[in-house]
Design a protein with these regions (language model features):
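Extracytoplasmic metal-acquisition and chelation regions
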Residues: 9-289
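C-terminal segment of classical bacterial N-terminal signal peptides
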Residues: 1-8
């Protein structure tokens, strides 16, 4: 009986649908909708930066074995087209950001040229759109599981609705003139737009280029002029730049914000819901009276 157990377990896993999500936050959303019917792999893991990710042959194998792939798009995964081509995958691919209103901004390095902010998940309203797209994608790829995906999505959307009210109430306790902070890269524009906060960053929407001395000097002048109370680290970036800016301006160093990746399982942001709660907790701790 014992000898047969591993084979049974293996059969059970083989019957699951192999799904690839491009990064850890998306992997968690997919996992909540797919539940026990799917096996999810995130290409870019916890505390890792999707902007500068370099795929390996092992990642191509993951795509080749997948039945379904979920991508964020909006310019986040610049490496994905080459990886899909190299893998020869026949998986169905779904763009989870379909239907959101993209945030456009001036490209500081190319004046007159706009870039799209890919970090749409930082607004819970957008995360709900992601969940609906994941539900529909899984239902299309696996019609027998449609009712399961619909039930899972409905339950998870209710949790996101409660989370959104929680976030709005917490940010509402921060005085309006304190709702301005500095983060390493411009990952929180959707959060700021949704919940009434201003995030200023020495780096643009991607972390793939170091800010120039001129960019940093501009930020330092802005902090002094606007009396911005706090600067925050991100889990995916080198903290030294923020430490330098804080030292030169006297701004308080807030906690670590989770922007493009979850924490590992032992950290405070191991799921999307935990990530949003952790970020709000750090913001209110540093900014609320």
């Amino acid at each position: 009986m014992f000898a047969g157990a591993p084979a049974q377990a293996e059969d059970k896993i083989q019957n699951k649908i192999n799904v690839v999500a491009t990064f850890s936050i998306l992997g968690d959303l997919v996992s909540n909708v797919g539940g026990d019917r799917i096996e999810v792999v995130a290409l870019v893991g916890p505390n890792s930066d999707t902007h500068v990710f370099s795929p390996t042959p092992a990642d191509a194998k993951k795509l080749a074995a997948a039945k379904v792939i979920f991508v964020n798009s909006l310019g986040l995964e610049g490496w994905m087209t080459r990886l899909v081509s190299a893998s020869g995958t026949r998986a169905m691919t779904f763009v989870v950001s379909t239907g959101i209103k993209p945030r456009k901004m001036e490209d500081e390095h190319h004046p007159g040229h706009q870039v799209t902010d890919p970090h749409a998940w930082q607004s819970i309203a957008n995360a709900k759109i992601y969940v609906a797209n994941i539900r529909d994608g899984l239902s299309k790829a696996d019609p027998p599981g449609k009712s399961v995906y619909e039930a899972n999505a409905k339950a998870y959307l209710a949790k996101l609705e409660a989370l959104e009210q929680e976030v709005k109430a917490a940010i509402g306790k921060i005085p309006a003139d304190h709702r301005r902070i500095i983060t390493t890269h411009d990952a929180f524009g959707y959060f700021g737009g949704a919940y009434g906060m201003a995030f200023i960053s020495p780096e643009g929407v991607s972390t793939d280029a170091e800010p120039s001395a001129k960019d940093v000097a501009k930020i330092i002048a802005q902090i002094r002029k606007q009396k911005i109370p706090a600067v925050f680290m991100e889990n995916i970036t080198d903290p030294r730049l923020m430490q330098q800016i804080a030292k030169e301006t006297g701004a308080k160093i807030g906690g670590t914000l989770y922007s493009d990746a979850l924490s590992d399982a032992t950290g405070p942001a191991a799921t999307y819901i935990d990530m949003m709660r952790s970020n709000v907790r750090e913001l209110t701790k540093a900014l609320a009276p």
